[in-house]
Amino acid sequence: MEPFRPQYHYTPEKNWMNDPNGMVFYEGEYHLFYQYNPAGDKWGHMSWGHAVSPDMVHWTHLPLALAEADNVMIFSGSALVDWKNSSGFGKDGRPPLVAIYTGFRTTDRVQFQCIAYSNDKGRTWTKYSGNPVIDINSRDFRDPKVQWHDATRRWIMTVSLSAEHKVRFYGSDNLKAWTLLSEFGPAGATGGVWECPDLFELPLPGTNDKRWVLVVNMNPGSVAGGSGGQYFIGRFDGTQFVAERDSLIPPRPGRSASESAHWFDYGPDYYAAVSWSDVPVSDGRRLWLGWMSNWEYGGDVPTSPWRSAMSIPREVGLSRTAEGIRLVQKPAREMESLRDRHFAFKSGDVSEANAWLKERHVQGDQLELMVEFAPRSSGTEGVKVLKSDTEATVIGVDRQRGRAFVDRTQSGNVTFHQKFSGVYDAPLAVHDGRVKLHLFVDASSVEVFVNDGERVFTSLVYPSAASRGVELFGSMTSARITSLNVWTLKSIWK
């Protein structure tokens, strides 16, 4: 029995997994590589595990892609399709897949950038004989994300100088020889090391304009404690990233973590988020996922024989808010393919909705739930999931304080690590008074999208087998629900 095995999130069959790596789309397949320990369920012997999917939802496990060798571990990085064979690694007129990763030499702990290539759709890989391609003799230089920049006709590498809270940009014509272009940082939150950067352009809704987003994952010191991720919005000319003024928050003594940066997830368990390369232009989406865990307790979570899962795939976009341009996320539409039984409640107050839920036996640990609360001026409302008489994970909005929150203090096993139990909140401007919550509940996780992804929370939970209930709550009898939809979700493994 594997009581906490997620049924629609990617997990390795066994052993330790952390950051998603090398995410690339090629010939109908989404590739997911990931930090993997082939030898055990704790961090170590870092190599790249591998899985492929036609839809980012249903995954096929593949053999280890890049293995630790000669005292060099394979740390995080990216992958791409070298369409014009600029690297010369192509074969028989077909473009190679090229992986760009950090090598970590265990003897002196120096980190450097390396490349490898594949001529068989990522099934087997050859490490480049000229590695490393960048070596600055640093112990904190990692996680290269590489993309083609059309305007300057060259490859751009975004890579972190982790301990200096900087991101470096390098340029190359052939993926082998690299030139330093510029640096960004320190900026935003600097309470931990900067890791797993990403850089991508997104359209600005309602205009013909675009903005660049620089993503920086950070550990520890993030908004929910431990690992998390921030972003900057600005412009990139192929050489330098310049953040817009309202994207930079000047440091101030006494400022809380939540106020010190723009965070893309306010829960404790969404880290190392990076986006897929080479998604077809005809699709047009920027898609990503993250490691659903936290370095504070990731090695202690009560699961066996595997440790860690990936989040669901998400689409990221920009939105104009009262505070400025902000990043929003929503579940990738492919998640709808998992919907099974559907329960729809039209409208009514909280007690009517709860009676309806009970009457129809709406419960489970594989659920998608969407609820909208009607406008009102004050009070707290939300939903409890994975509920029993003694346990529940509580998701809600406190209108008085202008905060959305997730409370896992009574979610089940919270004692396996002293830093696991907690309440996590985020500022929320309730514009027209309506509040929308969109939840994905799996065997050991809850992902929450508030008000169309304006705020997102990702949280691990370890409930008892009996904790399967769903219940709405409101602090005032006037709390009304304008719509409620619940779906049971199918397993991706059956």
Annotate each language-model stretch with its function.
Residues M1-P144, W148-W194, P203-Y266, V281-D283, ...:
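Beta-rich carbohydrate-recognition and catalytic domains
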Residues G206, G229-K494:
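Beta-rich accessory regions
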